[in-house]
Amino acid sequence: MLAVGAMEGPRQSAFLLSSPPLAALHSMAEMKTPLYPAAYPPLPTGPPSSSSSSSSSSSPSPPLGSHNPGGLKPPAAGGLSSLGSPPQQLSAATPHGINDILSRPSMPVASGAALPSASPSGSSSSSSSSASATSASAAAAAAAAAAAAAASSPAGLLAGLPRFSSLSPPPPPPGLYFSPSAAAVAAVGRYPKPLAELPGRTPIFWPGVMQSPPWRDARLACTPHQGSILLDKDGKRKHTRPTFSGQQIFALEKTFEQTKYLAGPERARLAYSLGMTESQVKVWFQNRRTKWRKKHAAEMATAKKKQDSETERLKGTSENEEDDDDYNKPLDPNSDDEKITQLLKKHKSSGGSLLLHASEAEGSS
């Protein structure tokens, strides 16, 4: 039963000593009262002989004639004076013993408090029980101070935790998401292979952006960074018209022939396919519609003028045809007196000229 209890003691200390504050409190309790006080015989009041002290400190097993009712090894004199720590076999059973916790580098105060345990066996055997109690209380105070320092500082509590941030690559710069060229340069610097050759990785950018069509290079000529807003000689802001490539204008004209107005999604799709902004496509269509209206109005005016002139010409020919019909109709002297009178008045001048020519011809003859 005692052996089982001796094995359960390190297990309890292993669970209780998982955190530094609990370890310090448990060490204080163990320093004041040993784990199994009934198993150890009382120490003699007088100083023991040098032979017995040397034999007890050097031999790992108790002597044959010693009085040990439980069959356990009595603690060494140095173990009692070293901060009231448990025996060596109990602390060696688990890596979470009090000596291991106090000797950790993250708690310098506790490691300094464990220095009295390194005292030689001769001096520890000559000390009395009152001296061991005084050293135990001092060690308890040092352990409590170390626990308070560890609990107050977050670095002491988190010192033993692994840092997984060192495994991940550094975060990308902000310009990586706004400039494809900068993203490509950053990708070459961060990774040994290009992004397209990495297995199982989807491309970061759209394929149309990474491998652009021929007219996408003209985006550089349309960007406002090239000076859509310049300064005049007087220092005033001067707006310049952006220039488009022939392929862009050809695609815009073909789209304009199909439809004169674009909806929002159609404008966005056309702008992306041509490497232009939506505002540029919108302004181009507005200007193109204005030009088309002017041209259409001019064509309509020309067609109207041509139609009017043709109507007048047709009207004149119809009147002449009516006159010819009147002349070609036969006359009835009994019923067409009014018609004969109108024809004579209309052609009086022409008839007079004919009579004049006839009289001149007769006189010359």
Swiss-Prot record:
Known function: Transcription factor which binds to specific A/T-rich DNA sequences in the promoter regions of a number of genes. Required for the development of insulin-producing beta cells in the islets of Langerhans at the secondary transition. Involved in transcriptional regulation of the insulin gene. Together with NKX2-2 and IRX3, restricts the generation of motor neurons to the appropriate region of the neural tube. Belongs to the class II proteins of neuronal progenitor factors, which are induced by SHH signals.
Biased composition annotated in UniProt, kind: Basic and acidic residues: 305-318
Observed phenotype of the null mutant: Embryonic development of mutant mice is normal until 13.5 dpc. At this stage, the normal expansion of pancreatic beta cells does not occur. At 18.5 dpc, the numbers of beta cells is dramatically decreased and the pancreatic insulin content is only 2% of wild-type. No effect on the production of other pancreatic hormones, including glucagon, somatostatin and pancreatic polypeptide (PP).
Localisation: Nucleus
Region (Disordered): 35-136, 295-365
One GO CC term, this protein: cytosol
Source organism phylogeny: Eukaryota, Metazoa, Chordata, Craniata, Vertebrata
The name this protein goes by in its record: Homeobox protein Nkx-6.1
GO MF term set: chromatin binding; DNA-binding transcription factor activity; DNA-binding transcription repressor activity, RNA polymerase II-specific; RNA polymerase II cis-regulatory region sequence-specific DNA binding
Keywords: Developmental protein, DNA-binding, Homeobox, Methylation, Nucleus
